[in-house]
UniProtKB/Swiss-Prot annotation:
Record's subunit section: F-type ATPases have 2 components, CF(1) - the catalytic core - and CF(0) - the membrane proton channel. CF(1) has five subunits: alpha(3), beta(3), gamma(1), delta(1), epsilon(1). CF(0) has three main subunits: a(1), b(2) and c(9-12). The alpha and beta chains form an alternating ring which encloses part of the gamma chain. CF(1) is attached to CF(0) by a central stalk formed by the gamma and epsilon chains, while a peripheral stalk is formed by the delta and b chains.
Keywords, sorted A to Z: ATP synthesis, ATP-binding, Cell inner membrane, Cell membrane, CF(1), Hydrogen ion transport, Ion transport, Membrane, Nucleotide-binding, Translocase, Transport
Protein name from the UniProt record: ATP synthase subunit alpha
PROSITE patterns: ATPASE_ALPHA_BETA
Underlying gene: atpA
Enzyme class: translocase
Record membrane topology: Peripheral membrane protein
UniProt-listed Pfam families: ATP-synt_ab (PF00006), ATP-synt_ab_C (PF00306), ATP-synt_ab_N (PF02874)
Statement: the UniProt record of this protein carries the keyword Transport: yes
Primary localization: membrane
Entry annotated with the keyword ATP-binding: yes
Protein function: Produces ATP from ADP in the presence of a proton gradient across the membrane. The alpha chain is a regulatory subunit.
Organism: Rickettsia bellii (strain OSU 85-389)
Residue positions binding ATP: G169, D170, R171, Q172, T173, G174, K175, T176
Length: 512
């Protein structure tokens, strides 16, 4: 049988197509220099920026600099395991992290590996650590509240689901305490088993001491809050590359909940250390330094992270991701580079002051310069009813307070205003790890703003509040239930509340 040349060509093509070629070409380069967590690699001509490479020892690297004849990669782990002359291969992948509900209750590192000794995480879903933020069309306006359980915040600086609210202040002023209290306060919503009220929490520790992270884990476990919380830890002892990646990895975990119609809250503690880690990497990569030696793209570093916080439209599932970034200031200087950057990115800030903290006013929130730009739309009507002019009254009190040092030559109206201000400040104080329900907050603030506390000594305000809330829970539950269901104070309920407070104040003063 004679075959025509064209038939031979067809047969050969079919045979070639049927060959199962198992061998795969790998692009391999070589480490020509390594030090300070940076490896210079020769021979990876086609590698892309942001691609993951794998070193001979199994340690991963992230390519950040592309040059004519070499590339620079940050080592995602111990740089002692990478030696000059080691082979490096391309993975043709970008950084991914495990996501899903299986992560709840776990402590993981910046790459999503468990570090709590509780075994592997049973999740098969991965997500890229840098996803594009939702567009304008995919978003909805902020309309539902995130209840922190902290009176001064829920009343005066309300936070909505999908908002980005900065917590800023000097070291040791209670920034982390506010974040942890907010996580603990979500426990009640999780116990009610209504998915639309639940908020899943993610806490990212960047550049902190391991002992501090261990304390936070212990506190959340004791409060029963770890069941709905993920902790991502990139401590001070870990590579700068891991501290740089940690917030993005945690954000991807939060985006999983947001994109599946659920609600998540993410706390970045803190972004000052994140910027320092990025500055370290940039300087080692020999990128040009700018103001305070930070690289030129340090604004974009945080803006692309915080833009992922959003309230999604109903067409996209109606989920949300709320961000609470934390920034540490030096001697109260909010005009420094990183603080001003993050203030301009976020939708408001809670400013904590050392002076107030040392005076015993805790949480040490400076109400005058703290603001929530979009949260008021999410605040329930009952809160707006009791808040009234409290911000103005507190500002006037702060102004009049300075006159106290000049003695008692003040008119009776000014004295009365100062006494009222002192009681407002006292009623807004709150112990750590002691969140209040919305109804309890409303009752307490109502008593303060309507001047029911004027005859009660300042040092007994806390005792009065505890006894009043205990009494109302036992004998006037209908007042609390009405506020909870109506989300406002009805005329009938207000009358009941007035009668209760008048009688309770009389009895309290009489016992005194």
């Amino acid at each position: 049988m004679k075959l025509k040349p064209i038939e031979v060509a067809d047969i050969l093509q079919k045979e070639i197509a049927n060959i199962n070629c198992l061998s795969e070409l790998e692009e391999v380069g070589q480490v020509i220099n390594v030090g300070d967590g940076i490896a210079k690699i020769y021979g990876l001509a086609n590698v892309q920026s942001g691609e993951v490479v794998e070193f001979e020892s199994g340690v991963k690297g992230l390519v950040l600099n592309l040059e004519n004849d070499s590339v620079d990669a940050v080592i995602m782990g111990d740089d002692n395991q990478v030696q000059q002359g080691d082979k490096v291969k391309r993975t043709k992948e970008v950084l991914e992290v495990l996501v899903g509900t299986a992560l709840l209750g776990r402590v993981v590192d910046a790459l999503g590996n468990p570090i709590d000794g509780k075994g592997d995480i049973k999740s098969k879903e991965y997500r890229h650590i840098e996803m594009k933020a939702p567009g304008i069309i995919d978003r909805a306006s902020v309309s539902e509240p995130v209840q922190t359980g902290i009176k001064v915040i829920d009343l005066l600086i309300p936070i909505g689901r999908g908002q980005r609210e900065l917590i800023i202040g000097d070291r040791q002023t209670g920034k982390t305490a506010i974040a942890i209290d907010t996580i603990i306060n979500q426990k009640k919503a999780h116990s009610l088993n209504d998915e639309k009220d639940k908020i899943y929490c993610i806490y990212v520790a960047i550049g902190q001491k391991r002992s501090s992270v261990a304390q936070i884990v212990k506190k959340l476990e004791d409060a029963g809050a770890m069941d709905y919380t993920i902790i991502v830890s990139a401590t001070a002892s870990e590579a700068a590359a891991l501290q740089f990646v940690a917030p993005y990895a945690a954000c991807s975990m939060g985006e999983y909940f947001r994109d599946n119609g659920k609600h998540a809250l993410i706390i970045y503690d803190d972004l000052s250390k994140h910027a320092v880690a990025y500055r370290q990497i940039s300087l080692l990569l020999r990128r040009p330094p700018g103001r305070e030696a930070y690289p030129g793209d340090v604004f974009y570093l945080h803006s692309r992270l915080l833009e992922c916080a959003a309230k999604m439209s109903e067409e996209k599932g109606g989920g949300s991701l709320t961000a609470l970034p934390i920034i540490e200031t030096q001697a109260g200087d909010v005009s420094a580079y990183i603080p001003t950057n993050v203030i301009s990115i976020t939708d408001g800030q809670i400013f904590l002051e050392s002076e107030l903290f040392y005076k015993g006013i805790r949480p040490a929130v400076n109400v005058g310069i703290s603001v929530s730009r979009v949260g008021s739309a999410a605040q329930i009507k009952a809160m707006k009813q009791v808040a009234g002019s409290i911000k103005l009254e507190l500002a006037q009190f702060r102004e009049l307070e300075s006159f106290l040092q000049f003695g008692s030559d003040l008119d009776s109206a000014t004295k009365a205003q100062i006494e009222h201000g002192k009681r407002l400040v006292e009623i807004l104080k709150q112990a750590q790890y002691h969140p209040f329900s919305v109804e309890e907050q409303i009752i307490s603030i109502y008593a303060g703003t309507k001047k029911y506390l004027i005859n009660i000594p300042v040092e007994r305000i806390k005792e009065f509040e505890e006894k009043m809330l205990s009494e109302i829970k036992q004998n006037q539950k209908d007042i609390l239930e009405s506020i909870k269901s109506e989300k406002r104070i009805t005329e009938e309920n207000e009358q009941k509340l007035k009668t209760f407070l008048e009688n309770f104040v009389k009895d309290f003063v009489k016992i005194d």
